[in-house]
């Protein structure tokens, strides 16, 4: 069948309106940038080939340059592993299908995004990037002789359901005003929040809530996705089967689901993870939107921990769960470092709230894994623009305890 298909090349760009309509737009004086990431079905229809099969994801761009100077768009800033048009088209070449091969080459080349943007022009095209699921991060740089502009996007990708997209406070708190806090009351309010996540009934404590994030005006996912975090799939039959398959064959599953935990009577609003090359190992974070704001910016509370293995359990419907590393302060520090390295942090600090649990008297989570902690929560204030590492403010609040001798 693949031999016969190599003689056929029937792209259908008539359906491009679906991804163009959901394109995100950002602008600077004299410049407008529209971007959209294609899902697997959209790219197959538009390009006539199953690009997702080869881990390729086209990203559509439309850039209006109304300035008086030429701008340069380097695609490598958007995706360091992007493909050339010929690299993509050659994957679908047939041995004897000369006419179809030539048509593929010309079609993919014609649609490739140009990197030179003349003054007073509108340029459209595609960057052939590496496949991402759930969301795709795009860092776009436009450079001229007298200016450099950067734009950061977190683009939704059509496909299976993920935990945490388009979250609105009024969906969770329709009858309650969001309380806007100043810095001092932010500290005291979140130091008094419940120590831990719970089960669905709120009768048992789970993993500790060791993280507070104050978002910026832009999408709070930007610093996470920029550092290689992925949204987690929603836990359902399909994702459970894929998880089991990855476990049995020792494969990676970058978007594997997380077990639901509860705060404010609901499961996590957002679940992110940074996985290794095996399903058994990952750092993951769950976040809940709170009924509080800081200077008009939404505030989240969450937990971060590190999975170091997978084991069977009778406490989950899919009979498997991850085992967490007991030193959760290490993982709190890892996430903080990762966000600092993204550049999208303006200040950070630590506050009370969890309650200390030494290694000699650890607590357990809902699946029986032990953990110990100094009892602090990290608080991170995100920013819209990148901040040099040395210019990031550290709040003079609590100080994390050094690792105890008994835990070494």
What are the language-model segments listed below?
Residues 3-9, 81, 111-174:
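Surface-exposed edge beta-strand/loop patches
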Residues 8-54, 190-192:
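Low-complexity, acidic Ser/Thr/Pro/Gly-rich terminal tails and inter-domain linkers that flank the onset
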Residues 43-62, 66-70, 116-118, 201-202:
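Short, solvent-exposed beta-strand/turn "edge" segments of beta-rich domains on protein surfaces
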Residues 45-50, 65, 113-114, 206-213, ...:
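Second-shell loop/turn segments in exported
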Residues 57, 235-404:
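A cross-kingdom signal targeting lumenal/periplasmic-facing segments of multi-pass membrane
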Residues 66-118, 123:
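The feature marks short-to-medium sequence segments in extracytoplasmic or secretory-pathway proteins
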Residues 69-77, 138-140, 221-225:
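Short, hydrophobic/aromatic beta-strand segments
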Residues 193-223:
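Terminal, regulation- and interaction-focused segments at domain boundaries
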């Amino acid at each position: 069948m693949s031999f016969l298909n190599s003689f056929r090349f029937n792209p259908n760009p008539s359906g491009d309106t679906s991804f163009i309509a959901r394109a995100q737009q950002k602008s600077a004086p004299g410049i407008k940038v529209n971007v959209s990431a294609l899902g697997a079905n959209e790219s197959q229809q538009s390009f006539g080939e199953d690009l997702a099969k080869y881990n390729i994801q086209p990203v559509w761009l439309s850039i209006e340059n109304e300035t008086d100077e030429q701008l340069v768009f380097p695609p490598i800033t958007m995706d360091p592993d992007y493909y050339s048009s010929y690299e993509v088209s050659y994957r679908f070449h047939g041995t004897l299908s000369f006419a179809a091969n030539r048509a593929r080459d010309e079609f993919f080349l014609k649609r490739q995004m140009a990197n030179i943007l003349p003054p007073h022009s509108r340029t459209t095209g595609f960057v052939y990037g590496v496949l991402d699921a759930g969301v795709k991060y795009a860092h776009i740089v436009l450079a001229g002789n007298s200016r450099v502009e950067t734009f950061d996007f977190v683009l939704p990708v059509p496909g299976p359901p993920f935990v945490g997209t388009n979250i609105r406070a009024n969906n969770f708190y329709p009858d309650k005003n969001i309380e806007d806090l100043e810095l001092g009351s932010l500290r005291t309010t979140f130091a008094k929040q419940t120590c831990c996540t719970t089960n669905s009934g709120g009768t048992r404590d789970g993993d500790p809530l060791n993280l507070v994030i104050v978002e910026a005006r832009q999408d709070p996912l930007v610093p996470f996705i920029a550092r290689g975090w992925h949204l987690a799939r929603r836990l359902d039959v399909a994702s459970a089967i894929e998880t089991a398959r990855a476990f049995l064959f020792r494969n990676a599953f970058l978007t594997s689901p997380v077990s639901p935990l509860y705060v404010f009577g609901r499961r996590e609003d957002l679940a992110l993870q940074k996985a290794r090359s095996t399903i058994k190992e990952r750092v993951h974070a769950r976040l809940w939107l709170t009924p509080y704001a800081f200077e008009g910016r939404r505030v989240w509370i969450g937990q971060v921990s590190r999975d170091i293995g997978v084991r069977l359990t009778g406490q989950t419907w899919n009979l498997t769960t991850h085992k967490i590393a007991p030193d959760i302060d290490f993982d709190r520090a890892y996430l903080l470092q990762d966000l600092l390295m993204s550049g999208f942090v303006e200040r950070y600090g630590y506050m009370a709230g969890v309650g200390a649990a030494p290694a000699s008297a650890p607590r357990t989570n809902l699946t029986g894994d032990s953990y110990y902690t100094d009892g602090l929560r990290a608080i991170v204030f995100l920013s819209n623009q990148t901040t040099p590492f040395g210019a990031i403010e550290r709040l003079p609040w609590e100080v994390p305890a050094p690792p105890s001798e008994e835990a070494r």
